[in-house]
Structures are given as structure tokens and as C-alpha cells.
Amino acid sequence: MKPSTVKNLRRAADRGEPVSEETAFDILLARPDEIPELMNAATAVRRRHFGERLQLCSILNARSGACSEDCAFCAQSAHHETHAEVFGLLDGNEIAAAYRKAAELPVSRFGVVTSGRALSDEDIEAIAATVRNTSDPRVAWCASMGCLDRSRLQLLKEAGVSRFHHNLETAESYFPEICSTHGYAQRLDTVRAVREVGLEVCCGGILGLGESLEQRVEFAALLAREEVDCIPLNFLVPIPGTRLEARPPMKPLDMIRSIAMFRMMNPKAEVKVCAGRVRMGDLQAVIFYAGATGMMVGPLLTVAGRDVSSDLRMLEDLEFPASALN
């Protein structure tokens, strides 16, 4: 990193302010021996805004496969031939049971995730009824249900959903390489509608899709402008049968650099590390020192995660206090 970048990192750490796009790009070029300096800054920013608080979340694949969209990475797209399960919306009792099971873990959020561009009114009303009738003070309801309009989002909010997840996936300049069945503007409109109805915004994407480093910074800068509440970072897991099946996965240190860059550009947003984390191997524990405030645990959508007991043991080894999980 340039001397000016180190200076800018230290200033950002002291003030808790976002770094410039120029500094962010330099973060992605940090040499291995510069990673400790980068982690010092990212950890300082995390602690300034979040203390030692960490947040674990889990999700339920509540409707799978047969998606009309052609996202290049996705095993659930009907445009791809994969081994992903295909099933309709789960019964409300199944969703409620999964929520109650999650409440027995130290997770603070439980997300209901459905495939497809958007759920029907009937399905949304069914999920809203489940949320309305199932609650636990330990776990907040989240939803990820595609491109919904304000009226549908409002219905979910009134039922008890507190946060809506809708990824932009990548930089706007790279999105046409990833999806052709809908545009970036539609996704961005949904993100803004979520904010307008008063739900918290969970919005991030997948890194390692083939985007340039400049586009990775472009993406982080957009999330900063949108002032999202939480940024879930996924790392591409190439799935056989998808258009990106042959793309090599990111290297662990590149993942660390990217987490730190998103943290330094979005100092007040939660940064959660989700799918692809297992590919970091022995470096998984480093994510918190790169600025992450949480991670997704348990089953994912179409790729394997790590067993929850291993993740909880990792947090114990890091000596995060039990009170840190909220």
C-alpha cells in the first residue's frame, strides 16, 4: 500500500470515517505483510461503531428452484441444469418450526428466503400470518423474497418482519454480465422501497464473479451511498451446471482484503460474511479482525456451510464474550 493509504487508514480508524475510493482500491492491493496494518484499522472501525458485539443469523430455504431469472451464479435458475432441489413454498408450520429451532441457537436473526423474481400475494400473506403468530424475543424475523413493491413490503413489516434482504449482487457496471432477465434499476428500486416503508435494509452481493477490483470498489461505494444497514458478503462457490461453474474461487487473503475494504468504506453498516466462507479455511477466524460484525451460520441455500458447533467453538477460541452475541 502507498504511504498515503496507510495514513488514510489510520485517520479513518481514529475518526470512524469512510475511506475514499482511491484508498479502497489500494486496500485490495495490500501485500500479505501489510494485512496486519489493514486489520488494525478495520478492527478499530468495527469497535468504534459496534464495540465487541457480533451478530449471527441463519436462513431457511422456504421455496427452492425453478427461478425464471438467469443469474449466472445461481443453481436455482431454470436456465441452468443443476442438482438444486425444486419445491414450492413450505407450509407455515414448517417455517415456524425452523424459526423456533433457530431460537435455541445464539442467533439474533432468522431469514425466510424464497426463489423467484417475487412471491405472489397469496404466498406473502401466508408467510405474514406465520410471522405474526410466531415470535421469540431472542430472534428477529427477516425476509428475502425478491423484487417486492411497497404494499407487499408493508404487509411483511406489519406482520413483524424487521429487516428485508435484497442483494444488488455486484457493481452496476458489471451486472449485465451476470443477469439479462432484469435490470439493475429494478433491484435498486426494491432496496429503496424497503427503506421507504421503514424496514431495515440488508443488501450486499457475491464477490469473485469476474468483476474487476475497480468494480468491487464501485459496488462498495454504491452501498455506502444507499446507507444500507447490513452488507452480507458472499464469495462465489462455482456450482456445476451454472455459467460460472469453471470460474476459480477467490483466494483467502483476497477475501480478507475485500471484507476490510467494505468495512472501511461502510463504517456504520453491519458486515456479515455468508456463503463461501468455508473456502477461507484456517483464515475464517480472521474475518472479525478484517471488520466483519457477524456471519451466517447453519444451512445455506444450495451450497454447504459449516456446522454450527464449529462456528461457536471458533468464537470461544477467539474469546469473544458470550454477551457479544446479540
Curated annotation (Swiss-Prot):
Keywords: 2Fe-2S, 4Fe-4S, Biotin biosynthesis, Iron, Iron-sulfur, Metal-binding, S-adenosyl-L-methionine, Transferase. InterPro entries: Aldolase_TIM (IPR013785), BATS_dom (IPR010722), Biotin_synth/BioAB (IPR002684), Biotin_synthase (IPR024177), Elp3/MiaA/NifB-like_rSAM (IPR006638), rSAM (IPR007197). GO terms for biological process: biotin biosynthetic process. Pfam families: BATS (PF06968), Radical_SAM (PF04055). [2Fe-2S] cluster binds at C142, C202, K272. Signal peptide: none annotated. Binds 1 [4Fe-4S] cluster. The cluster is coordinated with 3 cysteines and an exchangeable S-adenosyl-L-methionine. SMART domains: BATS, Elp3. It catalyses: (4R,5S)-dethiobiotin + (sulfur carrier)-SH + 2 reduced [2Fe-2S]-[ferredoxin] + 2 S-adenosyl-L-methionine = (sulfur carrier)-H + biotin + 2 5'-deoxyadenosine + 2 L-methionine + 2 oxidized [2Fe-2S]-[ferredoxin]. Pathway: Cofactor biosynthesis; biotin biosynthesis; biotin from 7,8-diaminononanoate: step 2/2. Its cofactor is [4Fe-4S] cluster; [2Fe-2S] cluster. One of its GO terms (molecular function) is biotin synthase activity. Residues 49-277 form the Radical SAM core domain. Coiled coil: none annotated. Homodimer. NCBIfam families: bioB. Belongs to the radical SAM superfamily. Biotin synthase family. Catalyzes the conversion of dethiobiotin (DTB) to biotin by the insertion of a sulfur atom into dethiobiotin via a radical-based mechanism. This is Biotin synthase. It comes from Syntrophobacter fumaroxidans (strain DSM 10017 / MPOB).
